[in-house]
Amino acid sequence: MSYVKYEEFLKKYGTPRTDAEGGEVALKKPDAIKALDLLKNTDIGILGGDVYELEGDGYFQPAYDNWYCDKNSDEQAIFAKKSRKMAIEYLLNYEEKPDADIWYVIVTDR
């Protein structure tokens, strides 16, 4: 896929975390996993991500959970693949509280 498809997906399925233009976009878990899959055949790496709980008033409360991937000396393509795998594993293994409205922000190196 391409970064353009990824950005289009974020616009369609994501929710802006703040009112800032070009700011972070939060996604529900299935959409976050799909967004990462859209970057599969690119050299775009995932620097990390943050977890938020959406409160009733629309405020994204930090859950103080996150992940990150160090680039080290990896080539870009290797880092991109490694970091996407790490992000997907984090999302799949993250246990959401049943009564919480959990959202994820993905941080790319682009």
Q: How should these model regions be labeled?
A:
Residues I44-K85, Y90:
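Acidic, low-complexity, intrinsically disordered interaction modules
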Residues A77-R110:
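Amphipathic alpha-helical binding modules
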